[in-house]
């Protein structure tokens, strides 16, 4: 009986540990660095929704802003962007290092970027054609995949 009780408690704790709690918030509740970026570069782009996600027993909070033109930007708990989705919208190239922008515009100018991720090891760029590029922290191309 003790084993069964321990297993049940363990399952409940594991569920709580990995559960995510989504909620809508006001723009003013975003970290100051996020507000500054949005006000500086997206002031003319109406915001449809601002969401906060609490994870890991609410020790970590992530944010998502959905804009009217189809751009969605995710931010970490420090207010730094982590992912950009640009389905049907222009890519905000100012958020990428210049070296990556030059490479992408020169070599893949006819492809449409749909997602950009900032990773611990660099940047990942995904195209609607299935091409994925991985750049290191020095903006050097390290991986090219075509799905």
Predicted regions and their residues:
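Bacterial Sec-dependent N-terminal signal peptides
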Residues: 1-22, 38
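Interaction-mediating elements
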Residues: 21-147
């Amino acid at each position: 009986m003790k084993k069964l009780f321990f297993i049940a408690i363990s399952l409940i704790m594991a569920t709580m540990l990995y559960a995510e709690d989504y909620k809508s918030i006001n723009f003013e509740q975003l970290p100051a660095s996020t507000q500054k970026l949005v006000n500086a570069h997206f002031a003319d782009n109406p915001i449809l929704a601002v969401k906060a996600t609490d994870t890991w027993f609410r020790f970590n909070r992530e944010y998502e802003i959905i804009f009217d033109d189809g751009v969605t930007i995710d931010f970490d708990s420090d207010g730094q962007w982590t992912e950009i989705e640009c389905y049907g919208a222009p890519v905000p190239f100012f958020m990428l290092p210049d070296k990556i922008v030059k490479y992408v515009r020169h070599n893949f100018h006819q492809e449409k970027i749909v997602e950009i991720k900032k990773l611990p090891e660099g940047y990942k760029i995904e195209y609607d054609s299935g091409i994925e590029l991985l750049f290191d922290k020095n903006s050097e191309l390290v991986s090219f995949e075509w799905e």
